[in-house]
């Protein structure tokens, strides 16, 4: 059994092995899509293959759509060359359910794949042709938050971007430069309307995409490299929009145990490829069953009925509320709490932590008792139900190979938004008292204990990458697992850092509590567990 148009001709064999196959006429859909494309997506990675492509497949199966997707890859061309083309753009989606069941789907809704490479003349000409089509309604992106940045870590323009500003839209080298050049082709074809939709997992993502594209339009116009009206076109909401979205679905890298499962079914040529850009890609993707995509409904050229595939369309303010609900209360804070204590207690899978009574109670209390009273309720999703799903379905899912070590990455950048907003909301409330927060301060103390790089049994471990490690680790460098230390003197400066906690913990009235917890957790090996038992 081979994953290709030829290999899928023997449908009975695939169906016998438990695979759901496309139910539509793919040749007909391919022809219609190439002639009148409505949706092109940039970023041929796992999230797109597991989420957007599957939504479109379901709508094609139900006869709601008659055209599929075109995908373009601009960061790593080998994904298209080594994965899409050899498999005729088919993907196997393995949905790993919390109840132990596995769903296997052959996704065939992607019918054309291209590289966003100006040196590949035929691909780039085809992209320009797609962008000039009246039928094009939406251009979507999963290129990571970094993909929208025109500067490096020091704030200096990236060299490709700088070169593109002066060479213009003919043959740009930078990713956003190429996208801007394609949008310029649409402008030249008659200022045709389109929605440019970032679907990356970052706050106000549409603004990030707009800022990057607008900068190119501005520079090119200043340097007289485009027609004078291009910038006005990018700025005209009746013609080009940059909707905000909130996406949530975990798609870990292809897992070896899933690969074995598919091999047992008799599927050949499943080997993952590690590209020269270090992308780990396979003919299959594995993902959790839960998925959320909330989109600001701003589509100047119309859009298909994607809500019939489970996507939610609403106004910008609601997208923002959903984002805040997830990031500040209902998912991300719970992940961080489990990450910090998971590393300290020697866990290697997040799902295993939900079998730990103290840790389970810790996140339940942070979510339901401390977070929910101040949650931003978006209306389109119920916050309590969202937490229910996180704690009962998503995090305990044994098939999701997520680790506390991965989630602990960059914790210093996450605490302010994930916990600081709740503290501020308590401080601003007439009914609530910051001093009622008992377990959020415990997570802060847990993080400081984590920075010692010694687990609860006294064994050293590697800290996950974090840009502030060199800043904060020296404060805990002299702490040991023994009684009688002056913990507060060691960490008082850190507790004042608003950029880490979102507030000065002394001003908020929580510093004493954090120091007390940290003192208890550094008494001896085993003290982290004892502290959890005592306070959770």
Model-inferred region functions:
Residues 1-42, 46-536:
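Substrate/ligand-engaging "lid" and interaction regions
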């Amino acid at each position: 059994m081979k994953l290709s148009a030829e290999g899928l001709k023997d449908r009975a064999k695939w169906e016998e092995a438990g695979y759901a196959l496309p139910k539509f006429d793919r040749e007909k859909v391919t022809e219609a899509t190439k002639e009148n494309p409505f949706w092109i997506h940039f970023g041929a990675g796992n999230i797109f293959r597991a989420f957007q492509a599957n939504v479109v497949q379901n709508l094609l199966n139900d006869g709601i759509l008659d055209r599929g997707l075109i995908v373009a890859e601009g960061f790593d061309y080998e994904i298209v060359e080594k994965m899409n083309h050899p498999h005729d753009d088919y993907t196997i989606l393995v949905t790993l359910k919390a109840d132990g069941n596995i769903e296997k789907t052959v996704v065939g809704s992607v019918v054309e794949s291209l590289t966003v490479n100006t040196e590949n003349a035929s691909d780039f000409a085809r992209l320009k042709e797609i962008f000039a089509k009246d039928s094009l309604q939406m251009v979507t992106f999963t290129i990571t938050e970094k993909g929208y940045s025109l500067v490096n870590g020091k704030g200096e323009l990236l060299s490709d971007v700088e070169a593109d500003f002066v060479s213009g839209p003919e043959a740009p080298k930078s990713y956003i430069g190429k996208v801007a050049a394609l949008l310029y082709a649409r402008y030249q074809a008659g200022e045709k309307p389109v929605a440019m939709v970032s679907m990356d997992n970052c706050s106000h993502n549409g603004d990030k995409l707009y800022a990057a594209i607008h900068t190119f339009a501005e520079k090119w116009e200043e340097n007289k490299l485009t027609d004078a009206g291009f910038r006005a076109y990018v700025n005209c909401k009746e013609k080009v929009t940059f909707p905000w979205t909130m996406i949530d679905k975990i798609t870990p890298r292809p897992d070896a145990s899933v690969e074995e499962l598919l091999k047992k079914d008799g599927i050949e040529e499943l080997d993952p490829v590690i590209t020269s850009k270090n992308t780990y890609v396979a003919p299959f993707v594995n993902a959790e069953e839960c998925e959320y995509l909330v989109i600001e409904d701003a589509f100047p050229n119309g859009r298909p009925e994607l809500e019939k595939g489970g996507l939610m369309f609403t106004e910008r303010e609601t997208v923002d509320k959903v984002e805040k609900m997830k990031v500040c209360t209902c998912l991300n804070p719970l992940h961080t709490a489990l990450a910090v204590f998971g590393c300290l207690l020697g866990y290697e899978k997040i799902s295993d932590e939900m079998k730990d009574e103290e840790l389970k109670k810790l996140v339940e209390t942070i979510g339901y008792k401390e977070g929910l009273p101040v949650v931003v309720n978006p209306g389109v999703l119920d916050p309590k139900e969202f937490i229910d799903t996180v704690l009962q379905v998503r995090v305990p899912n044994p098939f999701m190979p997520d680790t506390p070590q991965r989630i602990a990455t960059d914790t210093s950048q996450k605490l302010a938004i994930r916990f600081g907003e709740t503290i501020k909301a308590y401080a601003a409330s007439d009914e609530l008292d910051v001093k009622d927060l008992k377990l959020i301060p415990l997570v802060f103390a847990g993080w400081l204990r984590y920075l010692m790089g010694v687990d609860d049994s006294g064994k050293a471990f590697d800290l996950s990458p974090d840009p502030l490690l060199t800043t904060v680790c020296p404060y805990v460098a002299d702490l040991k697992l023994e009684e009688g230390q002056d913990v507060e003197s060691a960490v008082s400066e850190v507790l004042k850092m608003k950029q880490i906690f979102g507030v000065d913990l002394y001003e908020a009235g929580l510093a004493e509590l954090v120091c007390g917890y940290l003192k208890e957790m550094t008494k001896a090996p085993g003290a982290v567990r004892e502290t959890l038992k005592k306070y959770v």
